[in-house]
Amino acid sequence: MISASRAAARLPLLLPRGGPVPAVPGLAQTFWNGLSQNVLRAASSRKYASEAIKGAVIGIDLGTTNSCVAVMEGKQAKVLENSEGARTTPSVVAFTADGERLVGMPAKRQAVTNPHNTFYATKRLIGRRFDDSEVKKDIKNVPFKIVRASNGDAWVEAHGKLYSPSQIGAFVLMKMKETAENYLGHPAKNAVITVPAYFNDSQRQATKDAGQISGLNVLRVINEPTAAALAYGLDKSEDKIIAVYDLGGGTFDISILEIQKGVFEVKSTNGDTFLGGEDFDQALLQYIVKEFKRETSVDLTKDNMALQRVREASEKAKCELSSSVQTDINLPYLTMDASGPKHLNMKLSRSQFEGIVADLIKRTVAPCQKAMQDAEVSKSDIGEVILVGGMTRMPKVQQTVQDLFGRAPSKAVNPDEAVAIGAAIQGGVLAGDVTDVLLLDVTPLSLGIETLGGVFTKLINRNTTIPTKKSQVFSTAADGQTQVEIKVCQGEREMASDNKLLGQFTLVGIPPAPRGVPQIEVTFDIDANGIVHVSAKDKGTGREQQIVIQSSGGLSKDEIENMVKNAEKYAEEDRRRKERVEAVNLAEGIIHDTESKMEEFKDQLPADECNKLKEEIAKMRELLARKDTETGENIRQAATSLQQASLKLFEMAYKKMASERESSGSSGDQKEEKQ
């Protein structure tokens, strides 16, 4: 039987302690009853001085739907084109049946025929638990498999292999890294990566993990609206308050900032991490499926390939309706039943689409109002409204923003590229290339711990400028308690259980004493990335315990290291595959050129030498027939050998032709002399 004191020793709840007071056992209850609220606080804020970074710092917008990379060139940020010539890259990763990994547009193109192994919008899963309500909603809407990982997080599965959302993000980041390296002409190691402003600590940590897995040194994680504000305000001299309305592919953020002589100070931020273009696509998809069933009695939800075609058509129609008042959705041979093939032909007007997504647009209103309230500004105080994210191209969204803020939004920044540009500018600041900019961001959600009765006691309130550090002294909740469990939460609800549990740790070795006597100082330290560090110290013994908060799931150090190795292995496989393809292209080109020249100069070439060369070509073709099992180096060597042999033969032909020309020329001269 566990004694009362031993049972009490495992109580996880702390009692907020008043101070400084004599250590009288009965006094603790007095404080708990609320007769004194002078909670001992030691709060301090510090600036993080970063040393100048060597080499280029790339800025990456790791988006839900599309990603973008930029670098500083002098005082200007430049958005880079990928290998397909596009300035944005779809955040899509696919695994083919033979194990090849595709990223970006090649992955998106084959989604219809490979829906179960093509991952998109996985940013919405990053840092989330499998049991989260948002994840449950996503499971119903996506064709790929979302599974529970051993740590309770939401992961995805392809061909029987499990991948964390951080890994999928890392594959996209590797593509961004490669794009930057192709432009710069040298390796790119350092990066600034953006996250939605309303991301919690788990999601920020998981994004940083993605950077690490991709081989990047993530110098800073900054908020997307803040990055967009940097892109907007870098060359602006006037002081003003601006609002950044960021409705992207998967998330919505609203931030209120004050720009003053190069200082960008975030006054407040709000948002919804599960609201974006993907939801607009899904709403239209459901409408189309419903209409198709009404007209044909065929339920498309049972056909993943047909659904993927409808999903792509929905995205295309959504984009077209931003510039047209009506669009046609035509999908021939979408499915079939006993009566034959079924085609989808539908006209969709802009007003119809606006009706379908009206509730989604309406969901952006309350966060905007809350952000203004928290920043203590009215709409008349806001000098400019910046639109960020592809969904802000929708006229109805622009009208909603105008109604909200009482002014037409600015078109000063490219909504697809502003965030990456801002990230590159912040990279320039860290590298010492941009010196006249200071960024003061905020933490989006309140942070605190669970205390007696399951109450959420806040140490750092939302919209506090970061980096910041705050401390508060607590005490034990039971007599003889020798250890306390610190549960760290993030959110705005009064009860700890209603907020996000970021992590927990235990401080042990507290000398037994009556409840309320020990003094336990809990310190929260938020770094410039918005990532939380927590420590607890028994002031009596000096014993301390500290952690960098990871979610109660999250990736362990070993898991991250394994994923880094896997990413490197994939990079090596990609390099070998590319090397092989280039060698095959070279070989096929040499075969084509050789055969063309042999036909052209057949009269000048010795028959036996021609036959030898034909044998070489036949051997080369045999090698190419088994190209999938050959190395690029072997194919290249064989191709080079064939090229050398053909050059020797054609050299003989040229010499023969030259001597024939000379002899015909000299015989002509002799004829002239005789005349």
Curated annotation (Swiss-Prot):
One of its GO terms (biological process) is negative regulation of hemopoiesis. It catalyses: ATP + H2O = ADP + phosphate + H(+). Interacts strongly with the intermediate form of FXN and weakly with its mature form. Associates with the mitochondrial contact site and cristae organizing system (MICOS) complex (also known as MINOS or MitOS complex). Component of the TIM23 mitochondrial inner membrane pre-sequence translocase complex. NCBIfam families: PRK00290.1, PRK05183.1, prok_dnaK. The gene is HSPA9. Residues 65-433 are annotated as: Nucleotide-binding domain (NBD). The N-terminal nucleotide binding domain (NBD) is responsible for binding and hydrolyzing ATP. The C-terminal substrate-binding domain (SBD) binds to the client/substrate proteins. The two domains are allosterically coupled so that, when ATP is bound to the NBD, the SBD binds relatively weakly to clients. When ADP is bound in the NBD, a conformational change enhances the affinity of the SBD for client proteins. Residues 434-443 are annotated as: Interdomain linker. It comes from Gallus gallus (Chicken). Mitochondrial chaperone that plays a key role in mitochondrial protein import, folding, and assembly. Plays an essential role in the protein quality control system, the correct folding of proteins, the re-folding of misfolded proteins, and the targeting of proteins for subsequent degradation. These processes are achieved through cycles of ATP binding, ATP hydrolysis, and ADP release, mediated by co-chaperones. In mitochondria, it associates with the TIM (translocase of the inner membrane) protein complex to assist in the import and folding of mitochondrial proteins. This is Stress-70 protein, mitochondrial. The keyword Transit peptide applies. InterPro entries: ATPase_NBD (IPR043129), Chaperone_DnaK (IPR012725), Heat_shock_70_CS (IPR018181), HSP70_C_sf (IPR029048), HSP70_peptide-bd_sf (IPR029047), Hsp_70_fam (IPR013126).
